[in-house]
Structure formats: structure tokens, C-alpha cells
Amino acid sequence: SYYMRLIFFLLIATLGLYSCNNDLTTIGQDLINNGNHIEVQTTLLKETGTIKIDSFITSSGRYGSAITEMFMGRYKDQYSGVTTASPCFQIVPVSRPSINFRYLLDSVTFHFKVGKNIWGDTTETATPQTLSLYRLARLPEFRTDQNDYFYNRDSIPWGDKLATVSFIPKRMIMNQVYFKLEKDTLTERMFAMMQNDDPIFRPNSNSEISYYKFINYFKGLAIQSGKDNNCLLSLEMIPDSLYMRFHYHNADQKYTYDLKLLSQRNEYQYFNVKNIPS
């Protein structure tokens, strides 16, 4: 029995030594299939560019539906550079005026309502924003080669400056901001035309635009941003949010008459957008 245990022990030891053989010469003898590979190429990059997808409807075209929102102002950041936006639109009478010759003109104001969207610095130390109101020198010209649309780079036919306003871009402040026009030749003449019941204030039954004669006389308005502005503001494009108001009186009685945003046909309304990359 002693010899049997000894023989069994020697057999186990021999098998253990054989299984622990450290001969490495057999490693790597078999080929392993590999579907991956590394390829190195050298390319000379000559030009690069950035493609920007337009996120704003800048024009409804001659037959499109109304634009409900435009943008105005100037905004600068380190990624997209400097972006400026200037809206262009028309105003028309809301009714035929009935103003007696005894009434005297006090002032003329232009009111606008900032929409929901604001880009830029609106903190307590925000930079005052400056906007200037211009009269259009002529009606914008359609791009007949592009389906009668205006594009974001189409220039605005700037005319005379009518007023300037500066304000801090805080919501409560902006809700009370308006332009105050000077009592000059233009406003005095328009008020006199109202008193004389001039034909431009009468609706045209045979035209697609009721007050087409008025638009031929007063081509429209545009708003320009100051060069130091740092906010882009949305602008509500509805008649009750964009209007020119004439303030006048007779004795102790005060009155107003409004020229509001054209909503019947708005093909001449668009806004110009420019971007200077960083």
C-alpha cells in the first residue's frame, strides 16, 4: 500500500509538470482573422465654410399668409458674430377720419409691442438699446425671378428718419416704450389732409388693398438698430401692436386717430437680416 501511494503521487506530479510547460515557441503559430485595419492619409485643406440654416420667415411673398412675427435689433456673440435685423412694413387708416378744422394737432407717436422672444443681455446692468424709425423712400421691389419673395439680404429703401428712442431691455420698460415724432412738415401735412378728407384716407372698393392710395402716398416704415445694441427683439405683427397715433384736441377735449399695420395684404412686409461672422 505504501508503494502504491508513492507510485500514484509520482504519476500526479509528472502530469502537473507536463501541464505547466513554459515553452512559448508555439504562441503565434496560428493566424488570427482580423477584419479591422488602420489607414493613414494626408489631406491638404484649402477652404472651409459654415452653413447656416435660416430659422426665420423673412417674407410671405406676394400671395402668402401673414407674418405674425418679425425681428429688430443687433446681437453679437463669439460663435455667430454680429447679427442685425430691420423690419419693414406698411400702415393704413383704420377708418375714414372726421376731424374738424378747429382741432389742433398736439403730437404724433408710433407704438410697437415686443414679442415673446428676446436674445441678448437683459440683466439689471443691460446696455440701453437704441432704435430709429424711418419712412420708406419707395415701396420695396419684388424679386420676380424668385417667385415674388423678399429675401433676408434684400435692402430696405430707407428714407427720412422720423424718430429715435432708447430704453433698457426689461420687459416692464419695453411695454411702455414708443417713438415720438416731431411736429414737422410731414405730420402737419398729414393732419391737414385728414381734416380735408383727402382721397388717400378713403377706402378703395375696386382694389385688393382698401387703402392703396394711402400706401402710394406713405410707402411704409422701417426700424433700424443702433450700432452699440446687443439685443435682438421680436416684434408682434398685428394691427393693435404696430400703429402711428395722432394726438389732437379741441378746447379741453382730447382725441386720437390711428394708422395701423396693414393686415389685409402684407406682401410688402419683410425684414432684412445681416450677419458678419466672427
Q: Which residues are covered by each model-predicted region?
A:
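Secreted, disulfide-rich extracellular signaling modules
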Residues: Y2-L10, T14-S278
